[in-house]
């Protein structure tokens, strides 16, 4: 995809602060030693066959945007060793947790990126992904910040370009307004169908879902999550 054909990246980043608590020395070492070996270089052209990105022999490739502490992504990479995963997380402390998990249990079917996910989406070849996961993204509560929500017409266009026909876009959130926002955007987009027949389809977590620390905190505070699945036409 050429630079001229990229959808607009919008006004500002889709994520908030990049850094929280100071990193410990071991975490800093992982950023210096492990991340460079796993990080995708979007300055180079993407391979037409994305499966060649991975050390492991894989049959399909999925993308997780904003993986937080990496609980779900690390779980999925172990659960599906023949699927390649690209994980994007710009928050430094979240990436540090993921790198620590990989230091203990390496994954040969995983690549990482620690900056804006739209750069990866614009880098990917057409119809190259078997799935995109976006779980508990920043809801940007204030109305003036809604334009920074990751679910947008421009990003759904990006999803539509890189997803194979029949591939899934999965979205989970505990913020009702963002859930409704996502439903409205996806249902009016010509490339996506909502896969739901009744409340049980969005009130129950995905099969094999490991849960996340953020989700557990939301439940403790009395919020409920919705789990949406959309199919690329």
Swiss-Prot record:
Residues annotated as binding substrate: 142, 174, 212-215
Domain of life: Bacteria
A single Gene Ontology CC term: tRNA methyltransferase complex
Pathway where this protein functions: tRNA modification; N(7)-methylguanine-tRNA biosynthesis
Residues at the catalytic site: 138
InterPro entries xrefs: SAM-dependent_MTases_sf (IPR029063), tRNA_(Gua-N-7)_MeTrfase_Trmb (IPR003358), tRNA_methyltr_TrmB_bact (IPR055361)
Family from the record: Belongs to the class I-like SAM-binding methyltransferase superfamily. TrmB family.
Cited HAMAP family: tRNA_methyltr_TrmB
Protein name listed in UniProt: tRNA (guanine-N(7)-)-methyltransferase
Encoding gene per record: trmB
């Amino acid at each position: 995809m050429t630079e001229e054909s990229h959808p607009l990246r919008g006004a500002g980043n889709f994520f908030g602060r990049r850094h929280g608590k100071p990193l410990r020395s071991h975490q800093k070492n992982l950023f210096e030693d492990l991340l460079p070996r796993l990080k995708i270089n979007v300055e180079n052209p993407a391979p037409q066959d994305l499966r060649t990105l991975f050390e492991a022999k894989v049959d399909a490739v999925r993308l997780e945007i904003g993986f937080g502490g990496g609980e779900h992504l690390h779980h999925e990479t172990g659960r599906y060793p023949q699927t390649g995963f690209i994980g994007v997380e710009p928050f430094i402390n979240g990436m540090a947790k993921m790198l620590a998990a990989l230091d203990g249990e390496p994954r040969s079917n995983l690549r990482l990126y620690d900056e804006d996910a739209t750069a990866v989406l614009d880098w990917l070849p057409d119809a190259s992904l078997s799935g995109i996961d976006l779980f508990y993204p920043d809801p940007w509560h204030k109305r003036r910040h809604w334009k920074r929500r990751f679910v947008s017409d421009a990003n759904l266009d990006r999803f539509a370009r890189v997803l194979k026909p029949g591939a899934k876009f999965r979205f989970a959130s505990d913020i009702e307004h963002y859930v409704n926002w996502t439903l409205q955007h996806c249902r009016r987009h010509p490339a996506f169908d909502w896969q739901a027949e009744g409340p049980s389809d969005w009130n129950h977590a995905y099969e094999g879902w490991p849960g996340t620390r953020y989700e557990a905190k939301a439940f403790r505070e009395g919020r409920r999550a919705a789990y949406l699945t959309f199919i690329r036409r």
